[in-house]
Swiss-Prot record:
Annotated Pro residues bias: 203-212, 272-282, 309-322, 783-801, 871-881
Bias-annotated ranges (Basic residues): 852-865
Binding residues for 2-oxoglutarate: T1449, Y1585
Main location: nucleus
Alphabetic keyword roster: Chromosome, Coiled coil, Dioxygenase, Iron, Metal-binding, Nucleus, Oxidoreductase, Transcription, Transcription regulation
Chain spans, region Disordered: 1-108, 199-233, 250-454, 479-678, 716-744, 759-808, 821-928, 956-1003, 1105-1125, 1397-1491
Protein name: Lysine-specific demethylase 9
Organism encoding this protein: Caenorhabditis elegans
GO MF term list: histone H4K20 demethylase activity; metal ion binding
Positions of Fe cation binding: H1452, D1454, H1593
Coiled-coil stretches noted in the UniProt entry, renumbered to this chain: 388-443, 947-979, 1122-1186
């Protein structure tokens, strides 16, 4: 209830202002009645209206529940009643102002009360004006009776507790406002004590009010501090002025401030209605406000990037009320605002303000989007709450990070474990493969063991160790993996010497070298202990051939992966005094023994471990593996794949010691005593040569080196190790040492070096076959062989007596040496050794030229003249091939005489089991060369191992054949040696193109390559291109006989001997081969085809065929090719039947010959003539059908079909669609000759079927009679039906109207005065009549780029006029249409028409003629108006005033229902009503008794483009670039009713009005989703088309054209049986579709 002020002079209260707010449902109040005030939510000071006074409102009851109900103001149901007006005391008391903090008002009834306290005293808010100072209108004032008074003068209010405090108040207008009473200040004490004292003083809370009717959500007190943009009030009222549902925060919020905006500025207070109580929260949230506000200041300071809020008035400091608890006795009050976090206990009583809102960034944190809790408990705040929260968050974040790190570590460990397992699996697989390969190796018989090696062997070959001392140890890690009990020999005891405790081990099998162990051995050697304080635990000998070769070459032998054996005891630590012997870095501390899990390491892992093991600056860790890999490639063994060293740590000292201990083989005999000396020697030498990056250069030592002399001074400061022998328990005690490790192969290599020093040749035989590689081979042959990484160190072999090999040893004898029984050797790689021996170094012609002393050796040698090893003298590098000049030597007679005078060279001594072949020296040189060429791929060398057996057999067969040829009569040899006319040599190795003959007395030397050199060619292939040995021998006999006969009679031909020649080109080649024509066609080494004819004539041949007649075969005839060239080329010519290919080859030969600069040779002339003849031959047979191959005929037919149907392959599509339709329906037959001209396709989007053909193709391939048959069969097929439904949506005959004259021009010339009706482009209702000539001239005048800007020509009848029709009877035009292709049978009176034979002038079905200008935009603003921008900076000009002319015909169907049952021929079509008496005779076919019988008509049209005959078109007219004049959309006849229903068509209407909707792509897509099939296509000028019945179609003219169209009622439309198509017995085809071969494709 609001307080009312009274005027002292009048005694009546001032009339308040007019109330505002919603009105009651009763209507607007008047001055005589009560004025309804606003709702409880409106708190304006003028909303109070006192109750009217008068007799009608007299108070008669003394009960406060009923007496004052009629005198209360019409405020609302919650307003308490007033005392009756007849009591002046109460009225006087009512006039006094109420200043009590709480007021309790009685209820309106006995049961319902309103015990809520209302705040009646509060301060005026800043910025809000006070109430009006003017008195209200008296008409709105009704005096209220004063309330009952009490003893102290205050009005009586029942249920009021405590008693209100009253203060006299002056008049509202005259009395100044009273000062504001400040709230009581609480004593200075702690927060808890102040709260307890304040709680004890407070009166008990009133009971909770009932739930109000109008519920208004009240914001919580926190909203005034959350940066919402509304500042808190300057001063808060004391707690005593608050109710149980209010708090200081509420008063600071905007809603409570509006609720109390009626406070007067003079300090007087008025009673306000209570605010609506918000509904209690269903689930109150226990939320500490202070905890939320603790970090508010920090949050706002950090949010510097956000926009600052609008400036607001800063709140005044207010006294902090004592805190209270939610569980206190005064439970009706909400807790006051909490103490700020920085407020100390001593300052609790000081005036404080809520936290300053510097930024609104934390409002989203403090004020969530969800509903705020109604009541917030306020437990005692702690100063450390914010710190605890931060620490908790930090601990949580740290724990989360630790968890993530643990997960990452677990994943990393898992991946590492998987990688290790994968490596182990791969290692096991490789080890298994090595074991399987080793199991295949067999050892030689035991009885073939070599004798014991004597000590003098080492001194016999002092120059062997010029490069580098042998490696003093051999890795024995692969002993366990390679041992085989069944082939293992008995071990022999080892003498105790050198201070080492040696444990006898099993001999190793010869395994392929691995890359990793050489480095591991080198590292183990670098960190080898210097003192023998502890004996070695496991030292195993290495008796295999690899181990022996390794010592000789000075490299560590590759070993197999170590098995999982317990690690040996660690060796003693190295002493610092021995570190000066090797420039390596010692480990700072000894490493731990290796774990058992690391024992089974793969070779790749070991190689990776040895990459960076504290190397010395002078030691290279990359060079030895590279050389070893090349050496392994030489041996045909692929190197192991490289392995990353990421998971393979560097081997520790114990591992290196283990390698050294397990790989130290005791030397046999007395050589074991010098083991330590050899080791020391190797260390010194290794330290000097370790820093080389490329291949190691030889370091020269004294000329004669004694092993003992080397050992003594080096090891004098090192104690001699004592080697004690320890045998395995299971092995028998050997009686005497057996030289198991001495192998014949090792002895061969040692003797090879002896041969190199001893053997001297008078003059080396230099074969001139190797052009590209021979120079480098000879240059490097002089250098001493470097150490080979693939051979283990062998023990000194026994002295073997061998004879020097002569320089002229025969090739066949070398074969015999190589094929000696191999029981004398225990090597497991004998095929490799044999293969490596076969290559002999040669020099080039350029080398001989540089020397200036050509070799005068006979061109043809015998066995005893060949086989000598080449001289070690170097050869100069060859100059470029393009600048080579011919090397001339004496005549053959001189060579023959010199050969006869030359004494036979000494033969080789008998080869014993220990005598190696002298050609082993070539193998060592090859290894040296291969080490130099790092670009060679090891895969190419594996071909040697694969093809070795087959090539050796071929070599033996070739040797036998050569021996058979040598046994021939001497007469044949004399004939061959006679003088022949000078001609170019045709050798395979030396091309005569580079060395043409310049003299008749001298000829180019030719040396045929040895057959033993072929297996060594790296880029060779296994393909055989020659005959067998027996066949070659027989063929050679024929060739010799032919040559002898040719020498006597030059005219004799040997074509009959060589076999029949099929072509002139082959005949020419054979003539060149036999010597009739000179041809300089020779090939160089196929290994280097650049710059030779090898890559031109025979590009596919990478390996040369073997020669069976040796060198003399190519020398017999100067102008003939070698026999092997002849045979290989003859086979190629037989296989290659293409003449064009041979011509291309010969053209390339001629081009190459001209580039070299010898265009006048016989070869060039003959090649040019041959090319010309081949071209003539090809031209002669080009059009000869008798020689046509079936494939050629088929390809020609396919090309013709492709020409008919373009590149899209429409013939295949037509066959597929036609085959599909034939299987489903009974189609009319069509001849197979005509099917290739028919195209049947389906629209890719609409799936409707279209049939079409091209008339231009038809008239090119068919005659007049055939064309007539095709036209009738095509029309029958196009109108085919199934149960009365057409199968095709449209039929198109392209270019069929070209034979017709321009009908528009013909009408303008022949009927110029014919009146025609012309429409308008801008007004469809406007129709103009003019002569035909005028219209034609107007159209031609405005015709431009395919359209003319003139009105369309309406339909013009060509068969006469009826009623208001325009046109006439144009007989000539009708005759032209009848004679046009395809149109005769389907004219309205044609053979296929139901009314066949009627007169043309009586036809109601047409034809009609009309002209359309095409769609365009027609401007209407004239030519004077410019559309250009008026201002130069304007962005656009004015829009043109133009209108669109849509030249369209909406969807329609050329059919109607029968109008009369008695006369079936009387039907209403889309254009005319047809009535014919001539069809009455055929009425028996019609369905008279069927009232629902539908008659329909097909439509036929002819399109012609509008062209100006007098104008010259800029674009040239092409047949395939015809203008598109119509855009057609046709719907499948099966969907007739669906289309009519979807488009709301009325088929009984004319075509123009059947459908009012234009069908575009959007509608088409929608209809397609409903299953309606359609086809959208373009019709071009000079096209003809026909539309079967029941086909709804839509036309749009895109270019100016003239059209002639008519309706035709086909016979089968009126047949009750509904045949599949028209019957045409005279032109029908009785064949089925299976006669076409392409139909089933």
């Amino acid at each position: 209830m609001r307080s009312t002020t009274f005027d002292k002079n009048s005694g009546a209260p001032e009339e308040p202002r007019r109330p505002r707010g919603p009105r009651t449902p009763d209507g607007e109040p008047t001055e005589a009645n009560e004025r309804p005030c606003s709702s409880s939510s409106s708190l304006s000071n003028d909303s109070f209206v006192p109750a009217p006074q008068g007799p009608q409102n007299g108070h008669t009851s003394s009960s406060h529940d009923n007496d004052y109900s009629e005198y209360r103001p019409r405020r609302g149901p919650k307003t308490p009643p007033l005392p009756p007006p007849d009591e002046p005391v109460k009225q006087q008391q009512q006039q006094q102002p109420i200043v009590a903090p709480y007021s309790y008002y009685p209820t309106y009834g006995s049961s319902t009360g309103y015990p809520y306290p209302y705040p009646t005293m509060m301060m005026p808010q800043q910025g809000i004006p006070g109430p009006s100072q003017h008195p209200a209108t008296p008409s709105y004032y009704i005096q209220h009776p004063p309330p009952p008074s009490m003893s102290n003068g205050a009005p009586y209010y029942p249920h009021m507790n405590p008693s209100p405090y009253y203060q006299p108040r002056p008049n509202y207008v005259t009395q100044p406002p009273a000062p504001i009473i400040p709230p009581p200040q609480p004593p200075v004490m702690t927060a808890s004590a102040a709260a307890a004292a304040y709680r004890d003083r407070l009166p008990p809370p009133p009971p909770k009010p009932p739930m109000p009717d109008l519920r208004t959500k009240e914001p919580i007190g926190i909203r005034s501090w959350n940066g919402s943009g509304i500042p808190p009030p300057p001063i808060l009222p004391p707690v005593a002025c608050l109710s149980s549902t209010m708090s200081p925060g509420m008063l600071r919020s905007p809603v409570p401030r509006e609720r109390f905006n009626s406070v007067e500025s003079n300090g007087s207070f008025s009673l306000h209605p209570p605010p609506p109580v918000p509904p209690p929260a269903k689930k109150p949230l226990n939320m500490d406000v202070r905890e939320l506000l603790n970090g508010a200041h920090q949050t706002t300071v950090e949010s510097v990037k956000k926009d600052p809020p609008a400036p607001q008035p800063r709140p005044r400091p207010i006294p902090v009320p004592p805190t209270t608890s939610y569980n206190s006795s005064f439970c009706g009050l909400l807790p006051p605002p909490p103490v700020p976090p920085d407020l100390r206990a001593s300052a609790a009583s000081a005036a404080a303000s809520p936290p300053m809102v510097q930024d609104a960034s934390f409002s989203s944190v403090l004020t969530p989007k969800t509903k705020a809790p109604e009541k917030i408990p306020s437990p005692p705040a702690t100063v450390t709450s914010s710190t605890d929260s931060l620490e908790h968050m930090q601990r949580k974040r740290k724990k989360q990070q630790e968890t993530e790190e643990q997960e990452k570590a677990a994943k990393k460990a898992k991946r590492h474990q998987e990688e290790r397992e994968r490596q182990k699996i791969e290692a096991e697989k490789r080890k298994k493969a090595i074991l399987e390969e080793a199991a295949k190796v067999t050892r030689p018989p035991a009885e073939k063991k070599p004798p014991v090696v004597v000590e003098e062997t080492i001194r016999a070959v002092p120059f062997v160790f010029k490069q580098e001392m042998p490696l003093p140890f051999v890795l024995a890690a692969a002993a366990a993996a390679a041992k085989e009990p069944e082939t293992r020999p008995e071990p022999r005891p080892e003498p105790k010497q050198n201070g080492y405790h040696v444990k006898q081990a099993e001999p190793l099998q010869a395994e392929p070298p691995q890359n990793g162990y050489r480095l591991a051995a080198a590292q183990a050697l670098q960190h080898e202990p210097r003192q023998a304080s502890e004996p070695l635990q496991n030292v195993q000998p290495e008796p295999s051939k690899q181990a022996s070769e390794l010592v000789q070459n000075g490299y560590a032998a590759p070993q197999e992966p170590r098995r999982a054996t317990p690690p040996p005891e660690p060796l003693r630590n190295e002493l610092p005094k021995h570190s000066d012997l090797l420039n390596v870095s010692k480990p700072s501390e000894p490493a731990e023994p290796p774990k058992p899990s690391d024992a089974p390491r793969e070779p790749e892992v070991a190689a990776a471990e040895a990459v960076i093991p504290e190397p010395s600056p002078a030691v290279s860790v990359e060079e030895p593996p590279r050389r070893e890999e090349r050496a392994a490639s030489m041996a045909g063994i692929p190197p192991p794949p490289p392995t990353s060293s990421r998971h393979s740590p560097v081997p520790r000292r114990e591992d290196r010691a283990e390698f050294m201990a397990r790989s130290t083989p005791p030397a046999p005999g007395k050589d074991r005593k010098s083991l330590g000396g050899r080791m020391a020697m190797w260390r010194n030498k290794k330290n000097k040569t370790a820093s080389m990056v490329g291949p190691p250069e030889p370091k020269e030592l004294p000329a004669v080196v004694e092993v003992e002399a080397i050992v003594e001074p080096v090891v004098e400061d090192q104690p001699e190790p004592v080697v004690s022998e320890e045998l395995k328990p299971t092995e028998p005690e050997p009686v005497e040492p057996e030289p198991m490790e001495v192998e014949p192969v090792v002895a061969k290599e040692v003797v090879e070096e002896v041969v190199e020093e001893v053997v001297e040749t008078q003059e080396p035989w230099v074969p001139l076959s190797e052009c590209s590689r021979s120079s480098s081979l000879e240059l490097l042959a002089e250098l001493p062989p470097p150490p080979r990484a693939s051979e283990p160190p062998p023990p000194p072999p026994p002295p073997v007596a061998t004879a020097p090999v002569p320089a002229s040893m025969e090739e066949d004898e070398i074969i015999d040496i190589e094929t000696i029984d191999e029981i004398t050797s225990t090597s497991t790689k004998k095929p490799e050794k044999v293969e490596k021996i076969k290559k002999a170094p040669v020099v080039t012609k350029a080398a001989l030229k540089m020397v200036g002393r050509p070799k005068k050796t006979p061109g043809r040698r015998r066995k005893k003249d060949r086989g000598a090893s080449p001289s070690p003298s170097p050869s100069p590098p060859p100059p470029p091939e393009t600048t080579l000049t011919p090397i001339v030597l004496p005549r053959k007679k001189q060579r023959i005489e010199k050969k006869k005078l030359t004494p036979p060279p000494p033969q080789q001594a008998p080869v014993t089991s220990h005598t190696p072949p002298p050609v082993e020296q070539l193998m060592s040189r090859k290894k040296q060369i291969m080490m130099e060429h790092s670009s060679l791929d090891h895969i190419q060398f594996k071909l040697i191992e694969i093809e070795l057996a087959a090539k050796r057999r071929k070599a033996e067969a070739a040797a036998k054949a050569a021996a058979a040829v040598e046994q021939k009569d001497e007469k044949a040899e004399e004939v061959e040696n006679r003088e022949t006319p000078p001609g170019p040599s045709t050798s395979m190795r030396s091309s005569s193109l580079h060395t043409p003959n310049t003299s008749e007395e001298d000829e180019v030397i030719f040396v045929e390559p040895s057959t033993l050199e072929k297996p060594e060619r790296r880029n060779g292939t296994t393909e055989e291109r020659v005959m067998t040995a027996d066949q070659r021998a027989m063929f050679d006999a024929k060739i010799e006989e032919a040559r002898r006969s040719r020498m006597s009679t030059r005219d004799c031909s040997v074509v009959s001997t060589l076999g029949p020649v099929k072509s002139k080109a082959s005949q020419r080649l054979h003539d060149i081969i036999e010597g009739k024509e000179e041809l300089e066609d020779s090939m160089d080494d196929p290994t280097n085809n650049n710059g030779t004819l090898a890559g031109i004539l025979y590009p596919m041949r990478s390996e040369r065929a073997e020669s069976v007649s040796s060198n003399h075969r190519s020398e017999g005839a100067g102008g003939s090719m070698s026999l092997k060239h002849h045979l290989a080329r003859k086979n190629e010519l037989k296989e290659e039947a293409n003449v064009a290919r041979r011509s291309e080859i010969l053209k390339a030969v001629v081009k190459r010959q001209r580039e070299i600069g010898v265009p006048t040779t016989l070869m060039s002339k003959s090649a040019i003539e041959l090319v010309e003849e081949d071209e003539k031959e090809r031209k002669n047979h080009k059009n000869n059908k008798t020689l046509s191959h079936p494939d050629y005929v088929r390809s020609k037919n396919e090309a013709e079909k492709a020409e008919f149907h373009g590149k899209g392959g429409t013939m295949r599509i037509t066959n597929r669609n036609l085959k599909m339709l034939t299987r489903q329906f009974d189609l009319p037959k069509m001849s197979s000759r005509f099917r290739k001209f028919v195209r049947i396709r389906r629209h890719p989007n609409g799936m409707a079927t279209i049939i079409s053909c091209d008339y231009n193709q038809i008239k090119q391939h068919l005659g007049p009679n055939e064309m007539k048959h095709f036209e009738r069969q095509f029309v029958r097929l196009g109108f085919a039906e199934n149960n009365g439904v057409p199968l095709f949506a449209i039929g198109v005959m392209e270019n069929a109207a070209e034979a017709l004259h321009d009908q528009f021009e013909w009408l303008a010339k022949n009927s110029p005065n014919t009146q025609v009706k012309v429409g308008s482009l801008t007004n469809k209702q406007f129709i103009e009549t003019m002569p035909m000539k005028k219209y034609y001239e107007s159209a031609m005048e405005t015709l431009d780029m395919g359209t003319f800007r003139f009105g369309p020509l309406m339909s013009l009848s060509m068969v006469g006029t009826k009623n208001e029709e325009a046109g006439g009877n144009f007989k000539e035009m009708l005759d032209a249409l009848n004679a046009a292709p395809f149109l005769g049978p389907i004219m309205p009176w044609g053979d296929f028409s139901e009314v066949q034979g009627i007169k043309e002038d009586t036809s109601d079905d047409g034809p009609i003629f009309w002209v359309r200008p095409g769609e365009q935009m027609v401007p209407t603003d004239g030519k004077n108006r410019s559309t250009e921008p008026r201002h130069p900076l304007a962005t656009r000009g004015n829009d043109r005033r133009e209108t669109a002319f849509n030249d369209r015909t909406n969807a329609h169907a050329d059919q109607v229902r029968e109008s009369t049952e008695d006369d079936p021929t009387t039907t209403t079509t889309t254009t005319t009503t047809t009535s014919s008496s001539s069809s009455s005779s055929k009425s028996k076919k019609s369905a008279k008794s069927d009232p629902t019988f539908v008659k329909s008509t097909a439509a036929v049209g002819v399109l012609q483009g509008i062209r100006n005959p007098d104008a010259n078109d800029d674009d040239e007219y092409y047949e395939d670039e015809r203008k598109a004049v119509k855009e057609v959309i046709v719907f499948d006849a099966h969907d007739l009713h669906k289309v009519a229903h979807h488009l709301a068509m009325d088929l009984y209407e004319p075509p123009v009005s059947q459908c009012h909707r234009w069908v575009d792509d959007a509608i088409l897509n929608t209809m397609r989703r409903e299953g309606i099939r359609y086809a959208k296509l373009e019709l071009h000028e000079n096209d003809m088309y026909f539309l079967p019945r029941n086909v709804i179609h839509q036309f749009r003219t895109v270019s100016a054209c003239s059209s002639v169209a008519w309706h035709v009622r086909l016979r089968h439309y009126y047949d009750v049986d509904q045949p599949a198509s028209l019957s045409d017995p005279q032109f029908e085809c009785d064949s089925d579709y299976s006669d076409d071969g392409d139909f089933d494709d």
